[in-house]
Curated annotation (Swiss-Prot):
InterPro entries: Tscrpt_reg_Rrf2 (IPR000944), Tscrpt_rep_HTH_NsrR (IPR023761), WH-like_DNA-bd_sf (IPR036388), WH_DNA-bd_sf (IPR036390)
Biological source species: Salmonella typhimurium (strain LT2 / SGSC1412 / ATCC 700720)
Keyword Transcription set for record: yes
GO biological process: negative regulation of DNA-templated transcription; regulation of DNA-templated transcription
Role: Nitric oxide-sensitive repressor of genes involved in protecting the cell against nitrosative stress. May require iron for activity. Represses hmp expression under conditions of elevated intracellular iron concentrations, in the absence of nitric oxide.
Organism ancestry: Bacteria, Pseudomonadati, Pseudomonadota, Gammaproteobacteria, Enterobacterales
SUPFAM superfamilies: Winged helix' DNA-binding domain
UniProt entry keywords in alphabetical sequence: 2Fe-2S, DNA-binding, Iron, Iron-sulfur, Metal-binding, Repressor, Transcription, Transcription regulation
GO CC entries: cytosol
Protein name per its UniProtKB record: HTH-type transcriptional repressor NsrR
C-alpha cells in the first residue's frame, strides 16, 4: 500500500516535532524548510493533525506548533487512519457490474486492516528515540 503525500508529510512533520527537545515549539515554515514541501500543503496537514489532537498550535508572538500529546502515546496506525483515505477500490454497482458477487473488496479490506494492525505496533517515540542519525539529518541535536 502506498501512502499519499499528505499522510507521508504528516508523519514526517510529527517525526520532526518528536525529535525536538521537550517542549520546544517549531513553526510550519521550519517544517516546510526541512522537508521541502509547500507551505500551503503543510498548513492543511497541520490543521488536520491539530483537529485530531496530534498537534497543538499556539498563536501569538511566542507561538508555534508542537506535539499535542507525548510521542509515546501517538500510535502510527492512528495517524495513518486520520490522514489516509483508506478506500482502495470504488465498489459501486453503477461503475462495476460484478459488485454483487465480487470478493475483491473484502480481500483488500482485510489487507488494509493487517497493514494498520502492524502500524499499531509502533508509536512516534519508537521512530525517534535514541536515533542519532535522524537527529543529524534533521539538525536537531
Amino acid at each position: 500500500m502506498q501512502l499519499t503525500s499528505f499522510t507521508d508529510y504528516g508523519l514526517r512533520a510529527l517525526i520532526y516535532m518528536a525529535s525536538l527537545p521537550d517542549g520546544r515549539m517549531t513553526s510550519i515554515s521550519e517544517v516546510t524548510e526541512v522537508y521541502g514541501v509547500s507551505r500551503n500543503h503543510m498548513v492543511k496537514i497541520i490543521n488536520q493533525l491539530s483537529r485530531a489532537g496530534f498537534v497543538t498550535a499556539v498563536r501569538g508572538k511566542n507561538g508555534g506548533i508542537r506535539l499535542g500529546k507525548p510521542a509515546n502515546t501517538i500510535c502510527i496506525g492512528d495517524v495513518v487512519r486520520e490522514l489516509e483515505p483508506l478506500s482502495l477500490v470504488n465498489c459501486s454497482s453503477e461503475f462495476c457490474h460484478i459488485t454483487p458477487a465480487c470478493r475483491l473488496k473484502q480481500a483488500l479490506s482485510k489487507a488494509v486492516q493487517s497493514f494498520l494492525k502492524e502500524l499499531d505496533n509502533y508509536t512516534l517515540a519508537d521512530l525517534v528515540e535514541e536515533n542519532q542519525p535522524l537527529y543529524k539529518l534533521l539538525l536537531v541535536e
